[in-house]
């Protein structure tokens, strides 16, 4: 059995029959019962999480739980596959309980004065004349806005480091309250006094976090070799740090459909594993698994555990565990298992746009890459394999994120298709080589560092230029609708079953 590029296992066995006829038997594991069960289990958990937000306080939630209870009883009494459907009901109940527990924790956080240690959860973020930080106080997350000397002091620290603070914990009262709550931020902390801890700001920082921060700092030093906005874009492409990107850059990347490039995704995870592949392949199975999982955890911490990173790292971790066990599993099954597990661990992912964009892009690649490739093989592109490798993944990922993009941001620009085709390959090279070269540049003399980073300056300038052209050449809305419709239509046509009889003799 061989795992192909998108993770769908297809076993082909040829058996000789009477005469010269041959029968090809395809065992497509992508359509196995486990795939359907894991997908349905993730969906049931999602339903439970949505109902669990209100518990039994609203009539819609009460009706939903009543339907689940009635369906569960009916299934147990009547169904032939009752154990499967009972497990789905259990998933819904577990999702509801976890959701209700998390919402209750957010709404029942202790408020009032506080004196003690605050651990930075995120890097300080400059906003206007102030600095925004999110810190963990007594196990709960609070948002703070700092100005003047406090802001300058905060900017000297990074996520994972600790500060001695005195202040007041207050409930959040703003129109962004729900957006903060689904990020586990329970209130606002008004800082009156802030100082470094006597033993040093890293006194309570874990060794693992310290190592990740040091590598991130070295990467930042390498990125700063590039001039102006190029360094900020390089940081976004390689390790997801978009804090230094100007508003104009953020706007043009969004308008051109390239905003996903500055968010760490599965592509970055794959490139990191590719960089260390030679070392990993020389290890035995068990040590290789341990080192792989440690690298994934380190990378997640270094990139600040964004939802897209969590999804990609979890999928890679599950794949490594399955491989170490001497088995194979399709990417679609791993994606469904990832969704199921992470929904239970953090129900608030259900309300994360970045999470759904990441899942959509990954799902598009898994489900559509092979059908699109087969469909395009009937055209002249079949004579140009490099063209297929260039076009197919981009189209599949864009179709995957289309539903979320339309619901949240509106119809995407038709320019996103050519912009992705032109920018993604170059951005991929920057992502693949950026980590080792930027690390070397961070420790090298300035003259050598400039030589090392010079090619990356050309690469990020190309990506930024494509984004600027895409922003400038915005087509009318009807063209956007037509382009999206053609893309969806092509995908649906590619997924239609095709029957071909190979043993007909002419």
Task: Give the ranges of each region predicted by the language model.
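Hydrophobic alpha-helical transmembrane segments in integral membrane proteins
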Residues: 93-115, 498-506
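Hydrophobic alpha-helical transmembrane segments in multi-pass membrane proteins
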Residues: 40, 48, 79-85, 189, ...
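Structural detector for short beta-strands of small beta-barrel domains
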Residues: 112-126
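Aromatic-rich juxtamembrane segments at the membrane interface
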Residues: 13-52, 182-313, 320, 473
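C-terminal regulatory/interaction regions
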Residues: 2-16, 30-41, 45, 55-59, ...
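N-terminal leader/targeting segments
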Residues: 1-107, 187, 207, 311
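OB-fold (S1/OB) nucleic-acid-binding surfaces
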Residues: 128-146
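Short nucleic-acid-contacting surface segments enriched for D/E, G, S/T with interspersed K/R
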Residues: 150-165
